[in-house]
From Swiss-Prot:
Responsible for the transport of dicarboxylates such as succinate, fumarate, and malate from the periplasm across the membrane. The keyword Cell membrane applies. It holds the Pfam family SDF. It comes from the Bacteria. This is C4-dicarboxylate transport protein. It is a multi-pass membrane protein. It comes from Rhizobium etli (strain ATCC 51251 / DSM 11541 / JCM 21823 / NBRC 15573 / CFN 42). The lineage of its organism: Bacteria, Pseudomonadati, Pseudomonadota, Alphaproteobacteria, Hyphomicrobiales. The gene is dctA.
Amino acid sequence: MIAAPLDAVADSKGKKPFYSHLYVQVLAAIAAGILLGHFYPELGTQLKPLGDAFIKLVKMVIAPVIFLTVATGIAGMSDLKKVGRVAGKAMLYFLTFSTLALVIGMIVANVVQPGAGMNIDPASLDPKAVATFADKAHEQSIVGFLTNIIPTTIVGAFADGDILQVLFFSVLFGIALAMVGEKGEQVVTFLNALTAPIFKLVGILMKAAPIGAFGAMAFTIGKYGIGSIANLAMLIGTFYITSLLFVLVVLGAVARYNGFSILALLRYIKEELLLVLGTSSSEAALPGLMNKMEKAGCKRSVVGLVIPTGYSFNLDGTNIYMTLAALFIAQATGIQLSWGDQILLLLVAMLSSKGAAGITGAGFITLAATLSVVPSVPVAGMALILGIDRFMSECRALTNLVGNAVATIVVARWENELDTGQLARALGGESEDTSTAGLQPAE
């Protein structure tokens, strides 16, 4: 676990000064990056390596964090049937809310119509601008995605940092440890001991988060400019507001039903949220999120299964974006889609969002995969939103992160693997929801 604050930085009341909190430092770094990128764009674009280097540092520890969390969690299970049960419940949750996110994006696009009146001639669009994404989309398939989960070698899975491959091996290894009983106890003891320095390393790496966030934000604003947002402000605003309402209303209702406050959860994971905002990478927050969910009372076995799987299958923000962006392109190019066309779009999106999971730029690639199958909407229309996709990706990643945090608590509660008292303490008990209603045990 990450070490407690040092006495040297504590004030007379035993609290850390506000500027020593990671979320304050990241927030300040984001603001500084925006200012530098806006006023000195050339310098801002040159700072891209800072963000890239930080993300690589975090990716370096993702595989061992997943392996240790999953393997030790499953090895400690007395009933191995729980592994299948947890995975099944998690997939049911993912399917339900991923589909709901797709439907919400479609409904909002029909009601708000952010692309109406643009009157873009599809023939004037440059298909070369999105050719790379379209090619990657054609390379993806459900069968290929599923077979790729199985690593060619154990070392290869860890070397490549493929989350699902590492998860696949970790689950099998954890089951094997549990099955050998006493013979595997020394291995479990070693892995448990190894967990402490690995999470300590995560804590050390997180100290560089402000530098990474500063460089990534300076690059984004320097390269694309704040002005690029204004050109498609309607789409960006619609997407951000829809995602915010999805988190507060839909996930908020799920949270309330399961005995905790979504606002309290957002406060609890604020450092991870700001990290995602600064780097536009949800992977950067994966180790910290897993650590915090375990500290919040979710059993390690549940955390280890739900969060890494959710990073590929529970992409609420990406799903809202897919249907909203697809209908925006249709509206902007003056293409009228029937309800039959939209239902086809929805069904294809449900499949393509899984087939391209875990790829860099997954949101844009899954959109290309969807449009390439639905003939009514031109794939070249993606050129309209290519310039603002970086700004959209931050909202996608933030929504995905919150969705996976909620999913972890819910699945843990369903499995009676949630310490509700510890959850209440972790979330702070500051919101009225948690202080008055309390946390009820799973039924």
